Amino acid sequence: MIASDLLRRIRNDLPMPVTIAALGREGPPCKMSEGYFRFVCPRCGEMRATVNPRNNLAHCFSCKKNLNNIDLLISLDYDFLSAVTLLEQWLNQYQTRQATQKTPATPPPP
């Protein structure tokens, strides 16, 4: 059984641009435009899916569908369990990188 807290963290704490970057060539084409991260909607094929940075949810302005990280991987033919497992790995890697970048440098001993 997958913990609901893990699903919440995957949806909210792993930025969609990080997920799409991790997918590489397998992921949808994307770009920054007018301060928003946009990508080709995997459902309709239009470059009109835009990520709202406040809630980490993508909305396609062509087909009117919403996507989170899990939905994105499922739309790319991952099954639910494989998607959650992979996204959990990427979330852990992302959080480790974030923690490493925020760690202050220790001053040299006197």
Model segments located where?
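N-terminal structured subdomain of primase-like DNA metabolism proteins
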Residues: M1-P110
